[in-house]
A protein has these predicted regions:
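Bacterial N-terminal signal peptides that target proteins for export
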Residues: 1-8
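Cleavable N-terminal signal peptides
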Residues: 9-10, 19-21
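N-terminal signal peptide c-region/cleavage motif recognized by signal peptidases
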Residues: 15-17
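Metal-dependent phosphoester/phosphodiester hydrolase catalytic core
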Residues: 20-218
Length: 218
């Protein structure tokens, strides 16, 4: 089993070391607001991580109107916040609502194609990556560490999510059998990834821990 270490968070921050290799350490973090100092990076640097996975809300640049100047500006400021050593690591990223472009946003957000392109450009996603030619930012990445195959999966719980019911302070269950969080294509993709017989360890980023899954038929 991985050894898990919790550090002072952005909002949620996890470190763990995979026991198959004493040299492999992957950092996780989310909810990183570019408007404020980020002293947490000093503590992270002391951990000598090899890779970093951004779990969402990697910037705060909500643009419900579709004017993306605010979002682009947020990314530019975030880039200046990142320490130099972080730029030398491999980074994986998935978004949540504040880098998606709309607070609590889901499939109804009209500008999601545009904000997805901005997301892809910021994280230097290659032109031949499937995410450049499909809807949603979900991904998988395989690693071989001391003959163990490890699969990292990031799920997009914004792009396809059915509308929330009720008010922000009084959400209501969604009993519509046609409602979804991932949508059929992402579910099928996920099933295929999880059925990989050669993978011994899965690391999955999914929906926020405080969202009540029973509010959806998934």
């Amino acid at each position: 089993m991985p050894a898990i270490k919790f550090l002072s968070p952005f909002l949620i921050f996890i470190f763990f070391t995979i026991n198959v290799s004493s040299d492999t350490k992957i950092g996780f973090g989310s909810c990183l607001d570019q408007r404020y100092p980020q002293k947490i990076w000093k503590s992270i640097a002391d951990e000598n991580i090899n890779k970093f996975i951004f779990l969402g809300d990697n910037v705060y640049g909500d643009v419900p109107s579709g004017d993306t100047k605010k979002l682009v500006k947020a990314y530019k400021l975030q880039a200046r916040r990142f320490p130099r050593w972080l730029n030398e690591l491999e980074k994986l990223a998935i978004w949540d609502d504040h880098d998606y472009g709309k607070n609590d946003g889901g499939s109804e957000y009209k500008h999601k194609r545009l904000t997805q392109k901005i997301f892809m450009d910021f994280w230097d996603i290659p032109s031949n990556d499937p995410r450049r030619n499909r809807e949603g930012t979900y991904f998988s990445k395989d690693y071989i560490i001391e003959k163990n195959k490890i699969k990292v999966i990031g799920l997009d719980t914004r792009y396809f999510r059915s509308n929330l019911l009720g008010s922000r302070t009084n959400r209501q269950p969604n009993n519509d059998l046609n409602s979804s969080i991932l949508e059929i294509s992402q579910w099928s993709w996920l099933e295929n990834e999880l059925n990989d017989p050669k993978t011994e360890i899965f690391i999955i980023k999914k929906i926020e821990v405080w969202l009540r899954l029973l509010d959806f038929v998934v």
